[in-house]
From Swiss-Prot:
Superkingdom classification of source: Viruses
Protein name per Swiss-Prot or TrEMBL: Outer capsid protein VP4
Misc: This strain probably does not use sialic acid to attach to the host cell.
Stretches for region Spike head: 65-224
Record family assignment: Belongs to the rotavirus VP4 family.
Residues carrying the site annotation Cleavage: R231, N232, R241, S242, K247, V248
Region (Spike body and stalk (antigen domain)) location: 248-479
Spike foot: annotated span: 510-776
Length: 776
């Protein structure tokens, strides 16, 4: 029988488990070899750094303190002061012009009586008599000589609570601080070659501009800012000041990392986003004074702009979320102005803009991480919309404004009829602005937000400038395309082919000859014979079968087989043990004038019908697992499928698994099944109808639901190809013998073919009705 194809698919489902497991193991092994999971494994929504976006401000903010820097020889720039922060006693800093000045600054701790200490100054050890009579303050004093072989003499002194010392080259002088904190003041020494003075600090130091002299004096007397006194501030090498700043290009492709097969490429792009709102204005029926709806709807916009000397073609889609519904009712009369609903976006709303362009960044936007974007804010203000009334002055909705602030960016996909495009989805939060919106000649005024009546305000578009950055995983060979993990485009192509195939199948089903169908239905169709009509599948029959079984495994039919026994048992046990009743047709003939009895009978019929529908839905599974000699609905379904596959010109190996799975679920939805016990037959359909009758006379009898429930669990279930109504109609018009009746009840294919050869219109019409139900 043709339904062998379905049983073969069910019986071989275990092979799919093994195949999937082997394929999964192989895939995991390949991933370990070629791609390092971790940052490369992020393929859905990328990590997002949300921020306020770019803030337009013309003020130049310059830091007061530059540093701290690590001790190192340093050519102090003219006009900049060096602040030194020593942590212990000893030489703090040395400076010389190599001709007439050699200066060393020494730090002495509090409470030191007169004593001689040895210091290394300019590479030579010198003994210096030092003292500090203060018990609370540190002493910084300058030792200076005017010749290479000269002796050092003490010049200026600074008593400090906080151990901060400063010096600066400016105006042919070397300026230092002297006195006692908190009243220390600057003092200058004339230096002949002051521009060539090189200093050698022995402690961390800062650099501060001469223009900040008041702040510098404050630091000398009262200490550095609190943030500089934390352990989180780490001194840098002074060489970092000489790093030349690199001018950022509008568009950059930077290789972050690279292996033999893959590389991570960072795309930095300056973009211009142009978008516009769209709306729908629906006027209500009547005399023309009422409006049903004014709402936002998604708007597409395509444009070109120049980015880094190249022309870019961009596409945006703008939509809104979290709209606020307003209404206005001017009265109950037909000539009173009213708006049933108009939408307004406010602080609780969001605007979404999907952006895509034809640059290289969007062609490799598959495996992405570190996605971030900064965008300017944009103000959207509404325009005027006049409500054209038949008579009288027109109300005008005017005003309203909101500002869009960027609130995040994620990856998304824009779908068209033929392709799906990777895009960026920018989310904007809103803040209301002036002016408010009003409806003139009404009491609606001073409301804030942007109404949907004229959200663009006469503009063609709104524009936002910004920059985004992402790191994408791409093949190292630029000639290769990025593989797509979840190929939405491929799936869409398959769906489009499936839709075309469904339409073709439905048309072909109407052209199948009934005699041809019977011949196909009684053939034992297996996997190879089912696919033999498709060109090019002979060599790929093995992989074709695996693909079909894999798809069929997820069908409702396959998932229900494993639960067949439990389902039938549960359904049978739920049958209420009530008295036997006649079928639906017989109940009507048993009508009496007593309304209560009539209502009880109708209720009982409805209850039985509901209970039987639970069982009849499982009878197909019971029939598949207990094959009989008769023809089944699945034989007809498989025969129609085979006939259409042979005649179709659009079936391919990619679409076939979906077609077979869909056919198993959707072909012949309205089915009837019967069980036979001696001379009695019980018949139940999937739509809840049921009959019980004698086989020899075809007379109805009371439907014993308990007996039926018992029979379906232990007796063969037969497809009612020729249902009771058709059988009774055939007997009434042509007359059939008891043997013919039994053969038709058992759906004997030879007897059915005999009636078809005789061109019996009743049997032929029944088969044609079943064929018409074979639709996708």
């Amino acid at each position: 029988m043709a339904s062998l194809i379905y049983r073969q698919l069910l019986a071989n489902s275990y092979a799919v488990d093994l195949s999937d497991e082997i394929q999964s193991v192989g895939s995991e092994k390949n991933q370990r070899v070629t791609v390092d999971p971790g940052p490369f494994a992020q393929t859905g929504y990328a990590p997002v750094n949300r921020g306020p976006g770019e803030v337009n401000d013309s003020t130049v903010v310059q830091p007061v303190l530059d540093g701290p820097y690590q001790p190192a020889p340093f050519d102090l720039p003219v006009g900049n002061r060096m602040l030194l922060a020593p942590t212990g006693p000893g030489v703090v800093v040395e400076g010389t012009d190599n001709s007439g000045r050699w200066l060393s600054v020494i730090l002495i701790e509090p409470g030191v009586t007169s004593e001689t200490r040895t210091y290394t100054m300019f590479g030579s050890s010198k003994q210096v008599l030092v003292s500090n009579v203060s018990d609370t303050k540190w002493k910084l004093f300058e030792m200076m000589k005017t010749a290479v072989d000269g002796d050092y003499a003490e010049w200026g002194t600074l008593l400090s609570d906080i151990k901060i010392y400063g010096m600066m080259k400016y105006g042919e002088r070397l300026f230092i601080y002297e006195g006692e904190t908190p009243n220390a003041r600057t003092k200058g020494y004339i230096v002949t070659n002051y521009t060539s003075v090189e200093v050698r600090p022995y402690s961390d130091f800062y650099i501060i501009s001469r223009s900040q002299e008041s702040a510098c004096t404050e630091y000398i007397n009262n200490g550095l800012p609190p943030i500089q006194n934390t352990r989180n501030v780490v001194p840098l090498a002074i060489s970092s000041r000489s790093i030349k700043p690199r001018k950022v290009q509008p568009n950059e492709d930077i290789v972050v990392s690279k292996t033999s097969l893959w590389k991570e490429l960072q795309y930095n792009r300056d973009i211009i986003i142009r978008f516009r709102f769209d709306n729908s204005i629906i006027k209500a029926g009547g005399l023309g004074y009422k409006w049903a709806e004014i709402s936002f709807k998604a708007a597409n916009y395509q444009y070109n702009y120049i980015s880094d000397g190249e022309e870019v073609t961009a596409h945006t889609t703008c939509s809104v979320n979290g709209v606020n519904d307003f209404s206005f009712n001017g009265g109950s009369l037909p000539t009173d102005f009213a708006i049933s609903r108009y939408e307004v976006i406010k602080e609780n709303s969001y605007v979404y803009v999907h952006y895509w362009d034809d640059s290289q960044a969007f062609r490799n936007m598959v495996y992405v991480r570190s996605l971030a974007a900064n965008l300017n804010d944009v103000m959207c203000s509404g325009g005027d919309y006049s409500f054209a009334l038949l008579v009288g002055q027109w109300p005008v909705m005017k005003g309203g404004a909101v500002t869009l602030h960027t609130a995040g960016v994620t990856l998304s996909t824009q779908f068209t009829d033929f392709v799906s495009l990777n895009s960026l989805r920018f989310r904007f939060r809103l803040s209301v602005e002036e002016p408010s919106f009003t409806i003139t000649r009404t009491r609606v005024s001073k409301l804030y937000g942007l109404p949907a009546a004229n959200p663009n305000g006469g503009r063609e578009y709104y524009e936002v400038a910004g920059r985004f950055s992402l790191i994408s995983l791409v093949p190292s060979n630029d000639d290769y395309q990025t593989p797509i993990m979840n190929s939405v485009t491929v799936r869409q192509d398959l769906e489009r082919r499936l839709n075309e195939l469904r339409e073709e199948f439905n048309n072909l089903s109407q052209e199948i000859a009934v005699s041809q169908l019977i011949d196909l239905a009684i053939l034992p169709l297996d996997m190879f014979s089912m696919f033999s009509g498709i060109e090019g599948t002979v060599n790929a029959a093995k992989s074709m079968a695996t693909n079909v079984i894999r798809k069929f495994k997820s069908s409702k039919l396959a998932s229900s087989v494993s639960m067949l026994t439990d389902s039938l048992s549960d359904a049978a046990s739920s049958i209420s043990r009530s008295t036997s009743i006649r079928s639906i047709g017989s109940t009507a003939s048993a009508w009496t004038n007593i309304s209560k009895q009539t209502q009880d009978a109708v209720n009982e019929v409805a209850t039985i019908s509901s209970q039987l529908s639970q069982i009849s839905g499982k009878l197909r599974l019971k029939e598949i697992t207990t094959q009989t000699e008769g023809m089944s609905f699945d034989d007809i379904s498989a025969a129609v499928l085979k006939a259409n596959i042979d005649r179709s010109i659009q079936v391919d190996k990619n679409a076939l698994p979906d077609v077979i799975t869909e056919a198993s679920e959707k072909f012949i939805r309205n089915r009837a099944y019967r069980v036979i016990d001696g001379d009695e037959a019980f018949e139940a359909s999937t739509d809840g109808r049921f009959f019980a009758y004698k086989v020899e006379t075809l007379e109805e009898m009371p439907f014993d639901i308990e007996k039926f429930a018992d029979l379906v669990t232990r007796s063969p279930v037969i497809s009612a190809i020729i249902d009771f109504k058709t059988l009774k109609n055939l007997n009434d018009n042509y007359g059939i013998t008891r043997e013919q009746a039994f053969n038709l009840l058992r759906s004997n294919p030879k007897v059915l073919r005999g009636f078809m050869d005789q061109n019996n219109p009743i049997i032929k019409n029944r088969i044609e009705q079943l064929i018409m139900q074979c639709r996708l």
